[in-house]
Amino acid sequence: MHYLIFMDVDGVINSVSFYETVKSITENPLDPEAIKRVKRLVELSEQHSNSVRIILTSSWRYGWNRDPKFRDVGGKIIDTGLAMYGLRIYDKTGVSETRDRPGEVLEYLRKYPYHVDGFVILDDANFFWEKYRLSEWWVKTDAKVDGFKESMIEPALHMLQNPPWWLRLINIGKKKHT
């Protein structure tokens, strides 16, 4: 089994309530408790999958690159913040001219070289996910309080384990991840 977690940053692993506790602009802007909840989702997913990968969909992706030499400060903050909890970004979605996040997720799924058994989208904003038939795999996080909450872990896991029927069509001809 091979799962993808499409993850935003603002409103998922940070929130307004967290920012209110930050005392200095030099402090890490990522909420350790929200990151631990994402870690819990990954751990539960790994019980059913041999591979769980986090794909960055956030505007923070502009500063993140697969090659660490090309990451800016924001990219390094994400890497460091997640690495403290044993997590890492595997990749990022592309950026369309229209900044169409649902379309970017679908394009990523289409171009991804391996068979995907399930995915979930963690995002605080509604980018018209329903228009792309993605709303059933979207966990609406809370940008104001706590981002990705404990109560969202089980629904996210359920979404990973129950992919859309059309994912089979996207997977045709793709190799299984080992």
What function would you assign to each model-found segment?
Residues 7, 56-60, 122-124:
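Short His-Asn-centered micro-motif
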Residues 18-19, 49-50, 67-68, 132-134:
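Short amphipathic alpha-helical segments
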Residues 71-178:
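C-terminal cap/substrate-recognition subdomain and adjoining C-terminal extension
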Residues 32, 62-66, 96-99:
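Acidic-and-aromatic substrate-binding clefts and catalytic sites of carbohydrate-active enzymes
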Residues 49-74:
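Substrate-recognition element of Asp-dependent hydrolases with the DxDx(T/V) motif
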Residues 1-50:
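Active-site neighborhood of HAD-like aspartate-dependent phosphohydrolases
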